[in-house]
């Protein structure tokens, strides 16, 4: 498998956004500004809450990040949907890490809860993805639960995140 490691740097994640990490048919991450992590610090095929795979990734918060200027004026907060998207990004990244091919698409989430916020004064966001199941048939799909932590406190939880890989995304 191409580039199958337990950690990835920002440069690696940017290579993924260009389609250079998991081969020409592997899934890609979004490019900045939508790339919502700076590094993946742990990836395992076993482990996590269900012993079916685990990812831990981080985003360093800077007070001048693009979303703070528009969400909201005079009340800056990172949009919760960006944290949710980061969890979907990581599920798709994991499918590529396992050797899956195709274009990643978020397929849903059962439940999302927000119990905190990410502010310009925050320092670090950490994502935890616990895989429940991987389906590897005509459609490759990952199902996982996720948590988002800000400066050590869990502030978002998501259950039953789903991402699929499509050989032809026009039929999605």
From Swiss-Prot:
The keyword Isomerase applies. Transmembrane segments: none annotated. The active site is at 71. Gene3D superfamilies: Hotdog Thioesterase. One of its GO terms (molecular function) is trans-2-decenoyl-acyl-carrier-protein isomerase activity. Its EC number is 4.2.1.59, 5.3.3.14. Belongs to the thioester dehydratase family. FabA subfamily. HAMAP family: FabA (MF_00405). PANTHER family: 3-HYDROXYACYL-[ACYL-CARRIER-PROTEIN] DEHYDRATASE (PTHR30272), 3-HYDROXYDECANOYL-[ACYL-CARRIER-PROTEIN] DEHYDRATASE (PTHR30272:SF8). This is 3-hydroxydecanoyl-[acyl-carrier-protein] dehydratase. It comes from Blochmanniella pennsylvanica (strain BPEN).
């Amino acid at each position: 498998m191409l580039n199958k490691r337990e950690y990835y740097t920002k440069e690696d994640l940017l290579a993924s956004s260009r389609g250079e990490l998991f081969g020409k048919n592997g899934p890609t991450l979004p490019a900045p500004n939508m790339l919502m992590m700076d590094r993946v610090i742990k990836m395992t095929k076993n482990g996590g809450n269900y012993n079916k795979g685990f990812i831990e990734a981080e985003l360093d918060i800077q007070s001048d990040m693009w979303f703070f200027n528009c969400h909201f004026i005079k009340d800056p907060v990172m949009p919760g949907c960006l944290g949710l998207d980061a969890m979907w990004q990581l599920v798709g990244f994991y499918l590529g890490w396992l050797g899956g091919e195709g274009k990643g698409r978020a397929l849903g989430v059962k439940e999302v809860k927000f119990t905190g916020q990410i502010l310009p004064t925050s320092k670090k966001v950490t994502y935890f993805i616990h895989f429940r199941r991987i389906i590897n048939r005509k459609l490759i799909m990952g199902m996982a639960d996720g948590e988002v932590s800000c400066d050590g406190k869990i502030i978002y939880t998501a259950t039953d995140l789903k991402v699929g890989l499509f050989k032809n995304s026009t039929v999605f």
